[in-house]
Amino acid sequence: MKRLSEIAIGQPVTIEKFEEDEIFLKLMEMGFIPGEKVIIEQVAPLGDPISIEVAGYRLSLRLNEASKIFVSEP
């Protein structure tokens, strides 16, 4: 399992679990649910934030938030 912050642009992955943290509920409300497929669409010029497609939506996450999401490759 890898962290979402380690995944390359365009590589589809599946959310597996979250690091226990206060951001857990915020991520769930945004559509980051275990079993959901995600793709990193873009990375800002300085590497932070990243743009992600999840549940048909395009969202931005900071790298420290993405590092709390564990994913697996199909």
Each language-model region and where it sits:
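Short, surface-exposed secondary-structure edge patches
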Residues: 4, 27-31
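Short, basic/aromatic beta-hairpin or loop at an interaction surface
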Residues: 6-19
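C-terminal structural segments of small proteins and small subunits
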Residues: 10, 44-74
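Short, acidic/hydrophobic/Gly-rich beta-strand patch recurrent on exposed beta strands
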Residues: 15-16, 31, 51-54
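Short alpha-helix capping/helix-loop boundary micro-motifs
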Residues: 22-26
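Conserved beta-strand/loop element in small beta-rich adapter and peptidoglycan-binding domains
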Residues: 33-40
